[in-house]
Amino acid sequence: MNSKFIVIEGLEGSGKTSAIAQVVDVLREQGIRDVVFTREPGGTPLAEALRTLIKDGVGEEPVTDRAELLMLYAARVQLVEGVIKPALARGAWVVGDRHDLSSQAYQGGGRGMDARLLQTLRDAVLGDFRPDLTLYLDIPPALGLARARARGELDRIEVESLAFFDRTRARYQALAAADDRMVTLDASQPLAAVSAALRHQLTQWLRAQAPSP
């Protein structure tokens, strides 16, 4: 089976960390040993430095929406070109904590940025590079944020209003409805139920990718 790029998307508190571990377990059960984990923003020294700027800002200086978007895509391009594409080229599978759908949901939905600007930027820097499968963990924002707060201190984006996350979720849901490479999982369920649903969906997808005898 050829190498694939699988991404986990979702709001804060949706359980992405647990889902990623589950994906890696399923892949290894299928005999796929060379699995590379990535996260966005981050994953390279430059991208990690940008992650800190995006999440924490610099002092009291406000971060404009466009500056935030450009930093996210700068980190993303560095990760794609420096880590993801080389890993896929050598035959490894890549499991990502977020990819560009996060920008479409958070910046396009949450921040209300122009969808045409987002698409133009995406096309210019990523072209036709896309994940083979995106598992979207759907959760009501109030529940997800309560889980995130229980983990500890929130970053600059996590302290946005509930309305911001409602808009972000709505955009995620619209993206999922229009993309046959996205699978939606109900992340408001107990962890065991989410894990079972993820395992089922991923196993079915892997079977469909296997070459015909």
UniProtKB/Swiss-Prot annotation:
This is Thymidylate kinase. GO terms for biological process: dTDP biosynthetic process; dTTP biosynthetic process; dUDP biosynthetic process. It holds the Pfam family Thymidylate_kin. It is an enzyme of class 2 (transferase). Belongs to the thymidylate kinase family. One of its GO terms (molecular function) is ATP binding. Keywords: ATP-binding, Kinase, Nucleotide biosynthesis, Nucleotide-binding, Transferase. Phosphorylation of dTMP to form dTDP in both de novo and salvage pathways of dTTP synthesis. InterPro entries: P-loop_NTPase, Thymidylate_kin-like_dom, Thymidylate_kin_CS, Thymidylate_kinase. ATP binds at residues 10-17. Its EC number is 2.7.4.9. SUPFAM superfamilies: P-loop containing nucleoside triphosphate hydrolases. The lineage of its organism: Bacteria, Pseudomonadati, Pseudomonadota, Gammaproteobacteria, Enterobacterales. One of its GO terms (cellular component) is cytosol. It catalyses: dTMP + ATP = dTDP + ADP.
